[in-house]
Amino acid sequence: MTDTPTKQENQSKTENPPSSNANEQRRGNRNNDRKRNRRGDSKNERDSEWQERVVQIRRVSKTVKGGKKMSFRAIVVVGNEKGQVGVGVGKAGDVIGAVRKGVSDGKKHLVRVPLTPNNSIPTLSKGRDGAANVLIRPAAPGTGVIAGGSIRTVLELAGIKNVLAKRLGSKTPLNNARAAMVALSQLRTHKSASRERGISLEQLYS
């Protein structure tokens, strides 16, 4: 036989509401949840600014003691189309993991590109990586991106809309992409070039 609560016990329960400390703790938890949501939203906004394109996915093998270990290698170009671009390489046992590592590696090797008002580059530039040589030069508005392969991908994700590019030597996508990155990293605005050389803009153009 179970004991039923008396009227006095019921009255004491109703007369004693939850303490104010418990209410304050709930409010604090809600505030912390809101702060976490804001931080998550700002991170998602930053991530949404970046675009990634897979240039190449290859199946590679590594000889180990027990035989051959198969994996995937992904070449990924990352950029925000606002003057920042990077090339990354990722290896993993599956394609998704290789692409994810390539994106992370590309964001670690970003290059800032000076853009002109017509979304071109200020001067001619050359880049080399291994046996690949890349030449890029500015173009007039309306020209578009005259390039091919991985070089075109790098230039587009950098935010360049009018440019001429020429590939010399190796046709390897990774070497060409890295050569284009070298060429972009050597670009300087006219003001910075005159400042580095210690001359005025008039002397630079003359």
From Swiss-Prot:
One of its GO terms (cellular component) is small ribosomal subunit. Keywords: Ribonucleoprotein, Ribosomal protein, RNA-binding, rRNA-binding. The N-terminal domain interacts with the head of the 30S subunit; the C-terminal domain interacts with the body and contacts protein S4. The interaction surface between S4 and S5 is involved in control of translational fidelity. It comes from Prochlorococcus marinus subsp. pastoris (strain CCMP1986 / NIES-2087 / MED4). One of its GO terms (biological process) is translation. This is Small ribosomal subunit protein uS5. InterPro entries: Ribosomal_Su5_D2-typ_SF, Ribosomal_uS5, Ribosomal_uS5_bac-type, Ribosomal_uS5_C, Ribosomal_uS5_N, Ribosomal_uS5_N_CS, Ribsml_uS5_D2-typ_fold_subgr. Residues 1-23 have a biased composition (Polar residues).
